[in-house]
Amino acid sequence: MSDILNTIIATKHQEIAAALASRPLAAVRADAEARGDRRDFVAALRAKHALGKAAVIAEVKKASPSKGVIREDFQPAAIAESYAAHGAACLSVLTDRQYFQGDARYLEDARAACHLPALRKDFIVDEYQVYEARAMGADCILLIAAALELPKMKALEALANELGMAVLVEVHNEEELDAALQLKTELVGVNNRNLRTFEVSLATTLKLLPRITDGRIAVTESGIATVEDVRLMQASGVHTFLVGEAFMREAEPGEALSRLFFAQS
């Protein structure tokens, strides 16, 4: 685990302890189990594939540890509406406060503003956060292989599925992919950003892609910034993309999405 990831995970455990002290697990579980309005995250991606289109998981992100504030005028509902109007398949919403200036209400607001399924983008290490995710309306959660032992990943995946959520498992190398492929999820995300150096290489996806088979969906994450990047991935058989920063830096995020993915089609 990288130094920054170690730091973030330590923070998460502190946050969970504080959350448990103010709101017990049973209460959050009850909220999660009472939450209706489930949207099928995987089906939304496959629907785009069936039309021969890129399936874009469009990110709602204010800031990051490496870049600082990315979008000053940050209005999650308006951003989500823009994405939905311009062909996004799903949303990804940052809920981590300390490092990404995210918030649970951003996911709630973004999802309420459109018809798209939403991923809770956070560093999930405990069942409490899985219940939180469903309670706030998430349709999918992120599990980062670098941050979790396999038995824990399996347990968190099982709970997410029980609550009606999909799981996107994120990997960066062969060892992490070995673990990810032992989960049931169809969604395998390849993070092109090295969490130790923050360097980005699209070759990471291309290297791991041949092993993401058996009906699984490979999701390329980080570093997709140009039409050439998109064409490279599509020519290699990748048709699902998680993109945030390239859209967040533009005045109209949805129009930026359309230019990047659909202008050439």
Swiss-Prot record:
PANTHER family: INDOLE-3-GLYCEROL-PHOSPHATE SYNTHASE (PTHR22854:SF2), TRYPTOPHAN BIOSYNTHESIS PROTEIN (PTHR22854). It holds the Pfam family IGPS. GO terms for biological process: L-tryptophan biosynthetic process. It comes from Chromobacterium violaceum (strain ATCC 12472 / DSM 30191 / JCM 1249 / CCUG 213 / NBRC 12614 / NCIMB 9131 / NCTC 9757 / MK). HAMAP family: IGPS_B. This is Indole-3-glycerol phosphate synthase. It catalyses: 1-(2-carboxyphenylamino)-1-deoxy-D-ribulose 5-phosphate + H(+) = (1S,2R)-1-C-(indol-3-yl)glycerol 3-phosphate + CO2 + H2O. CDD domains: IGPS. Its EC number is 4.1.1.48. The keyword Amino-acid biosynthesis applies. Keywords: Amino-acid biosynthesis, Aromatic amino acid biosynthesis, Decarboxylase, Lyase, Tryptophan biosynthesis. Belongs to the TrpC family. Coiled coil: none annotated.
